[in-house]
């Protein structure tokens, strides 16, 4: 196993270029299964979740070829099976997107569900299954999710999501792209990566309207053709580096972003006293004075993203006064708080809220990454803390952040990756 050694207490200066969006890539790669042709996907992030999904596609019979570091060519014309390897599926939570893609193209799917599906007291797959069933599929749940269409193709249907679910919205879109008839998703999620998936599918010949609103209409077509598509920049990666500047101080130019996607994060950081200047596809982020307190509530897009909750919590630990962070998406996303208190943070969790009393500084400690975004928060805390910290279980961080060590070093951070023997049980979120 690997851990990070971080010498903290130094401001960050320089430029960071944002990679392709992880949350878009992990849906668009499975969506390539719907294409009866060769698709070229550009701006793919070099992260372990992407590697795992591409291996799954190869196991199913796809031909996968990297053209360069961030562009990949996928040929799904000769898929040999609709059964996904249990060993491969367990490596990535987003393997459930394979169900919608395989159902949409072949009318059947068998996918072993990853262990992260039941965290926080909620079963996120429920809304996916509801949509598949409405479209005529029989779905059996056990060690595997086995789904089969009633006939050769899925049937268009009206689907109302009981809760706003990004995963269900995207999975139903994929299942409906080649369906017989029109599918309407109501109470749909609106995140940028949902729009990106719809744009990818439309570029390959799908007919999807309304992505980015709460009602999406998918008019089923007979076939999708090959093409070229570039994934959007990663909103959460950009926000993570912005939060790091807030916590550590300094000045960083964040390049290759879509400013509109950053509005909710930018506004909250500005409330805290961070200066953010927008120009074209860049944000100049500066923090020199003391951070101000604020309150944050995570909500579905365009609200403040739940995947940024741990990172901004770290910055608020160093703000003057009392801040309250409320988690409005997941039932339980505060397991990392215990790690921050070991570094001197003053936080108490009350239900869905964390009450934060700002402190002058954090102190170095050995901490663990319990999930992807909390792991990023631990790195930020270690960068801001006085002394040398160790962050373990960093393989979860590498699920969603391309070359985080190299990018932070380019900003002047003193951070190294070393091998170790110890591992800790974790959960996958984000």
Question: Where is each model-derived feature located?
Answer:
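Short, structured segments at the rim of ligand-binding sites
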Residues: 1-430
């Amino acid at each position: 196993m690997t851990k990070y050694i971080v010498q903290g207490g130094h401001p960050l200066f320089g430029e960071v270029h944002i990679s392709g969006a992880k949350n878009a890539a992990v849906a668009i790669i499975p969506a390539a299964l719907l294409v009866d042709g060769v698709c070229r996907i550009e701006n793919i992030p070099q992260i372990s979740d992407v590697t795992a999904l591409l291996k799954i596609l190869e196991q199913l019979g796809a031909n996968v070829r990297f053209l360069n570091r961030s562009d990949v060519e996928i040929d799904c014309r000769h898929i040999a099976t609709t059964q996904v390897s249990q060993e491969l599926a367990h490596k990535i939570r987003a393997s459930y997107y394979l169900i919608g893609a395989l159902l949409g193209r072949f009318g059947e799917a068998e996918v072993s569900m990853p262990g992260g599906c039941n965290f926080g007291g909620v079963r996120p797959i429920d809304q996916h299954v509801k949509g598949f069933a409405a479209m005529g599929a029989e779905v059996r749940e056990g060690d595997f999710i086995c789904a089969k269409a009633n006939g050769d193709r899925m049937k268009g249907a009206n689907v109302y999501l009981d809760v706003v679910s990004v995963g269900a919205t995207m999975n139903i879109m994929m299942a409906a792209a080649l369906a017989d008839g029109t599918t309407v998703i109501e109470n749909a999620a609106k995140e940028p990566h949902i729009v990106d998936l719809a744009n990818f599918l439309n570029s390959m010949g799908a007919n999807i309207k309304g992505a980015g609103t709460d009602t999406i209409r998918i008019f089923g077509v007979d076939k999708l053709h090959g093409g070229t598509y570039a994934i959007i920049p990663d909103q959460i990666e950009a926000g993570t580096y912005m939060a790091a500047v807030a916590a550590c101080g300094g000045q960083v130019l964040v390049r290759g972003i879509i400013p509109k996607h950053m509005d909710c994060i930018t506004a909250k950081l500005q409330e805290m006293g961070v200066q953010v200047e927008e120009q074209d596809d860049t944000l100049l982020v500066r923090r020199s004075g003391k951070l101000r307190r604020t309150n944050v509530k995570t909500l579905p897009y365009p609200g403040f993203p739940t995947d940024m909750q741990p990172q901004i919590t770290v910055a608020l630990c160093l703000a003057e006064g009392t801040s309250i962070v409320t988690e409005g998406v997941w039932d339980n996303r505060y397991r990392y708080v215990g790690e921050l208190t070991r570094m001197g943070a003053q936080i108490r969790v009350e239900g869905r809220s964390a009450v934060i009393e700002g402190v002058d500084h954090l102190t170095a400690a050995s901490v663990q990454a319990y999930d992807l975004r909390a792991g990023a928060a631990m790195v930020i805390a270690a960068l801001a803390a006085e002394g040398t910290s160790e962050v373990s279980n960093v393989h979860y961080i590498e699920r969603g952040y391309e070359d985080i060590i190299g990018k932070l070093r380019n900003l002047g951070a003193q951070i190294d990756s070393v091998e170790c023997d110890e591992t800790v049980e974790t959960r996958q979120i984000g």
